[in-house]
Amino acid sequence: MRECISIHIGQAGIQVGNACWELYCLEHGIQPNGQMPADNTTGGGDDAFNTFFSETGAGKHVPRAVYVDLEPTVCDEVRTGSYRQLYHPEQIISGKEDAANNYARGHYTIGKEIVDIVLDRIRKLSDNCTGLQGFLVFHATGGGTGSGLGSLLLERLSVDYGRKSKLSFAITPAPQVATAVVEPYNSVLSTHALLEHTDCTFCLDNEALYDVCRRNLDIERPTYTNLNRLVAQVISSLTASLRFDGALNVDVTEFQTNLVPYPRIHFMLTSYAPIISAEKAYHEQLSVAEITNSVFEPAGMMTKCDPRHGKYMACCLMYRGDVVPKDVNAAVATIKTKRTIQFVDWCPTGFKCGINYQPPTAVPGGDLARVQRAVCMVANTTAIAEALSRIDHKFDLMYAKRAFVHWYVGEGMEEGEFSEAREDLVALEKDYEEVGAETADGDGEEEEFGEEY
């Protein structure tokens, strides 16, 4: 088996996790108490969904997941929520005091006390696997726990499970919407760790998700639940081929192979289609060609950046539902002829497609319509550098005055770490610039991008 272990860190990670596991359970017909009436091989078996769920002898399906937070309230919601019977009590680990939006608290003072318990729990989960494929880490880079404890855990996972792939789903700070003043600090410090210790990072930001909810689903004031359910659909599409059998299955390691041209260039842009409310879906023909076109719409991106400002290096299309390879080839060919999507000149083809016959599942009472087919796009594009440089710029404005730095230093961090992380990101921006530059004229003037702050 190719098992995956999910690790949900901090409030964002846990709440996205809730939405994901709710969706997985619906997709596989697993009840909130872990029973699965349709499953004939009790206590194991080589069913495809066993990559994400382990089975007990009593026929109960338990997610291969760990929930971690430094304060109890969010974990308590899982412990008392409708899926409380799904998890083993030891899978939900909470501390007593908050990281208080402070990377240093999550990484040094408070995170240090909890990290060994978490690693022990992960070790128990991995002992339970026959062929562990890797880890999916869910966190936000702007807070304290997701950034600090998140990067601490990733560092320790690199040591303990060196060869296993680590994919991270990171909620990154949005341009206008912020939940904390020190977001840029936390984000730069944790991106520094993500650069080194993850194989692939999927960037999502709340503002882009808000816009998608407002525009496509006509939700005037989207709540976190709306956003998380949207994110869950994306993550479900990415992991569908691990959990179901399909025509063109895509493995976690295949993502890296096809999407990451250089180890540092691994920040991905995602989008999903059709995002459409039930009233509209009734009147629209959502053909393969149409949904394929709409995932490339700049407005539908899950991170605030404009793919037209950058070049694509690689692109992965994950179809699910009633889709045949012939339609996919036609849709991709159309996109190639349109020339709206610019690839770097050293990577001419750049599309990897996966097809999964399991149609997308709609959450009862959710916002998304039930549709026959859907597609999720993951792209490695130089446009994501816009989002990175935006955070770097905000970091610079604050750090020039050393604002708020004493909170970090007081928790045992050194000021040198700030400049080290920032220099690493300067190098990353440069890397993105060079990757997107034309190969023919290597010595031309490099133009700075990042026009909009």
From Swiss-Prot:
Cellular localization per UniProt: Cytoplasm, Cytoskeleton
EC number(s) recorded for this UniProt protein: 3.6.5.-
Cofactor: Mg(2+)
GO cellular component: cytoplasm; microtubule
Keyword Phosphoprotein listed: no
Post-translational modification: Undergoes a tyrosination/detyrosination cycle, the cyclic removal and re-addition of a C-terminal tyrosine residue by the enzymes tubulin tyrosine carboxypeptidase (TTCP) and tubulin tyrosine ligase (TTL), respectively.
One BP term from GO: microtubule-based process
Transmembrane feature ranges: none
Residues reported in the UniProt entry to bind Mg(2+): 71
Annotated GO MF terms: GTP binding; hydrolase activity; metal ion binding; structural constituent of cytoskeleton
Chief location: cytoplasm
Location of region: Disordered: 433-453
Active site: 254
Annotated site, Involved in polymerization, chain positions: 453
Binding positions (GTP): 11, 71, 144-145, 179, 206, 228
Known role: Tubulin is the major constituent of microtubules, a cylinder consisting of laterally associated linear protofilaments composed of alpha- and beta-tubulin heterodimers. Microtubules grow by the addition of GTP-tubulin dimers to the microtubule end, where a stabilizing cap forms. Below the cap, tubulin dimers are in GDP-bound state, owing to GTPase activity of alpha-tubulin.
Oligomer and partners: Dimer of alpha and beta chains. A typical microtubule is a hollow water-filled tube with an outer diameter of 25 nm and an inner diameter of 15 nM. Alpha-beta heterodimers associate head-to-tail to form protofilaments running lengthwise along the microtubule wall with the beta-tubulin subunit facing the microtubule plus end conferring a structural polarity. Microtubules usually have 13 protofilaments but different protofilament numbers can be found in some organisms and specialized cells.
Protein name: Tubulin alpha-1 chain
